[in-house]
């Protein structure tokens, strides 16, 4: 009850995800899919993920991958049209209502010479996105600007970009001027009323 190939293949699953890979093995009795090599997954929201190894459990609707690169093109994740949010991670665990990135780096900057965004990244031992309560959590977060650690936070949480109104920190902004040098602005929004 095993379906496998050692040739390049593209697969579309029941959730409209497309997976391009070098090889795969699928066990029909357990509904477990695995692959090692160059793997590209594109979901129905046009987010793309690259892996070197992937396991998919169809019964649990769970994807576990290693050496992951997530390029988030979904409008909910973008602060504005210029940003290209991405997360690089040792391990990723995608579930229906919860996504975990282990040993991760997150940024929205392009890292190009002419890019107006200073190269910054947020490193964390774990990043969790709870889709049900629309919150992103970070454990052991380090904010780096130009590869220099600026802040360490043992725990950080904020609403995901799809949330229109909730008390909490807003998206940080970074600037760099010749007179003042690099700076960070981290505004806090206080929702006095639920309306």
Regions found by a protein language model. Give the residues of each.
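Structural signature for solvent-exposed beta-strand/loop edge elements and short helix-capping sites
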Residues: 1-195
């Amino acid at each position: 009850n095993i379906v496998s190939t050692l040739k390049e293949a593209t697969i579309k699953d029941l959730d409209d995800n497309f997976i391009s890979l070098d090889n795969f093995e699928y066990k029909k009795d357990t509904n477990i899919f695995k692959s090692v090599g160059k793997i590209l997954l594109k979901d129905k929201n046009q987010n793309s993920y690259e892996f070197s190894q992937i396991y998919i459990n169809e019964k649990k609707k769970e994807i576990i991958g290693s050496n992951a690169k997530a390029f988030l093109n979904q409008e909910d994740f973008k602060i504005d049209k210029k940003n290209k949010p991405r997360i690089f991670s040792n391990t990723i665990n995608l579930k229906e209502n919860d996504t975990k990135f282990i040993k991760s780096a997150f940024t929205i900057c392009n890292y190009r010479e002419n890019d107006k965004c200073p190269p910054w990244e947020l490193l964390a031992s774990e990043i969790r996105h709870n889709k049900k309560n629309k919150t992103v959590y970070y454990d052991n977060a380090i904010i780096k600007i130009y590869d220099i650690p600026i802040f360490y936070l043992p725990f950080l949480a904020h609403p995901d970009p799809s949330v229109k109104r909730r008390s909490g920190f807003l998206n940080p902004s970074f600037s760099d001027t010749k007179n003042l040098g690099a700076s960070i602005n981290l505004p806090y929004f206080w929702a006095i009323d639920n309306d």
